[in-house]
Curated annotation (Swiss-Prot):
Annotated function: Responsible for channeling the electrons from the oxidation of dihydroorotate from the FMN redox center in the PyrD type B subunit to the ultimate electron acceptor NAD(+).
Name of the protein this chain belongs to: Dihydroorotate dehydrogenase B (NAD(+)), electron transfer subunit
Designated gene of the protein: pyrK
GO biological process: 'de novo' UMP biosynthetic process
Residues of the FAD-binding FR-type domain: 2-100
Recorded metabolic or biological pathway in which this protein acts: Pyrimidine metabolism; UMP biosynthesis via de novo pathway; orotate from (S)-dihydroorotate (NAD(+) route): step 1/1
Cofactor note: Binds 1 [2Fe-2S] cluster per subunit. Binds 1 FAD per subunit.
Amino acid sequence: MIRLETMKVVAQEEIAPAIFELVLEGEMVEAMRAGQFLHLRVPDDAHLLRRPISISSIDKANKQCHLIYRIEGAGTAIFSTLSQGDTLDVMGPQGNGFDLSDLDEQNQVLLVGGGIGVPPLLEVAKELHERGVKVVTVLGFANKDAVILKTELAQYGQVFVTTDDGSYGIKGNVSVVINDLDSQFDAVYSCGAPGMMKYINQTFDDHPRAYLSLESRMACGMGACYACVLKVPESETVSQRVCEDGPVFRTGTVVL
């Protein structure tokens, strides 16, 4: 159930150039699931629209969650100035999240993340690892300075890293690794830039458990304004809203 809450800032640090990890504390954490996002109000009077930021990790015991975001404009730049003890007006948790049901030690799962789309996969990896699921993760970044969460994800399984310029890991994009993987995966979870999502959507089009977590500009965040709609294959009238029906969609169910 979506709620409004004033959450407390526990900590914040810059983990890569213009990329920040923000730790929030509040009752809302108890309702959070992997793959959901929060809609944050910018703490000033000039920015009316909330900013959607995906949940990176969830600590229900301490009622804390981690958000990782990149400065994209004035709103997120203001978020980066927050420090311990500050508060944020938060709406959430929002979205359907990833379906992790019925996976156990007999299963093998592929996680694919690119750039600022990597953070929501951290909670997925953690929860799957706790169930004994074998996790293989493929990450794509522009260059070595943009690499995030590789060490954290390596706690939960094998991690491959690609960079566009070859400055870290394997040169190229995630397809270089995925096309060479011999393993069969029981589920695929992904989040990244539009080009990466199109590749995953096509490559795993007929996979019964392949999922895309999609990013979109949002206004209301409640499904009422239809600012974040996606078309559905073979339909001129039906659409899906990223904020309300997503952000997670099965491959082949939306047009990218």
